[in-house]
């Protein structure tokens, strides 16, 4: 599948892109290409969106002579390790797809399954993140699908490339996005995904749904967002990726948990408590009046909802919120 970025390239750049991808497919580390100036332009997209070539280091050198231009990649693993990891990844992914994916599921269902699998099976590699400028191969797996799928420990690049790889295996269009992740304290380079669900492009950031959750608070704050919503704490070059213009497949919209008023929130909580749901999660619509009031009123509304439940008793609740995305999670303790 040709990437969105590829479709924006001119003829010469496309030719160089194809020459590099074809060379990598044949296992080459030195590849002759048609243009020196095109190499840097296409290399990042190839690194991101061909995660099956996990053994190439994220460095590329282009050497120009009178007769030709040669692109040279560094190899991050031995040949025996490459074959071992290829075999392990193939076996793992085939088993996962056989057990979890079927033709009766919608694309939304499939993206949700992939999101949850990666979110729940991977530990964020804080040590690798702290040594981002390390010039050795000590942390190389944290940045590719070996770390994500085999070692179950990686940074955002590994999460995003694993999501891309799994989507490729089940026929869902997906891209790795490079940009900046921000909060009130800090900002740093970050990677996440854009997926195509029934013709609707949506942002998915598995890393942040993984990092901001604990054992009691699973998070869906970054599952299927439009450009406007994710831009609250992410920035990227929009020219390089398809526009995400709708929240049609947002997790909270699909689950009727996108809240825009106090009355709607109270009813949502009453219904959730009455069903004795173990974990309750909702998103406040940023464009609603409630968004400016929620932090001063959510506790009061929660207590009103508890008191309005006739047949359910709640002894205690735990609440956590994700401030930038206005996502709230409640874990109630029901009393028999």
For every predicted segment, state its role.
Residues 1-96, 290-296, 301-336:
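Linear, non-domain "peripheral" regions
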Residues 75-77, 180, 208, 286:
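A mature extracytoplasmic/lumenal domain signature
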Residues 78-148:
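Secondary-structure boundary elements
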Residues 84, 150-154, 178, 183:
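Alpha-helix capping and helix-loop boundary segments enriched in small/acidic/polar residues
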Residues 89, 110, 155, 159, ...:
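Hydrophobic (often cysteine-bearing) scaffold residues that line and stabilize catalytic clefts
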Residues 145-159:
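A short, highly charged nucleic-acid-interacting micro-segment common to nuclease
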Residues 158-228:
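Hydrophobic/aromatic-rich core segments of domains that either
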Residues 215-336:
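Low-complexity, Gly/Ser/Thr/Pro-rich intrinsically disordered linker/tail segments
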